[in-house]
Amino acid sequence: MQLTLNGNPRTFERPVVTVADVIRELALEGKRIAVEKNGEIVPRGLYADTPVDSGDRLEIVGAVGGG
């Protein structure tokens, strides 16, 4: 499957069906991240229920602490 991830084309060899699958493939489970799919924020509680299709654009950003 071909997705655009943070502005770069990315091919996933194993099937990814949901946003949760993408996060798992990227080893980001348990990390403090925010996900946007095709310009819409995906609430964390909906990652497993939000489908991804070839050609979708995902932006994934991590939280950065500071002071």
Enumerate the predicted regions with their spans:
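Ubiquitin-like/PB1-type beta-grasp interaction modules and other compact soluble beta-rich domains
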Residues: M1-G66
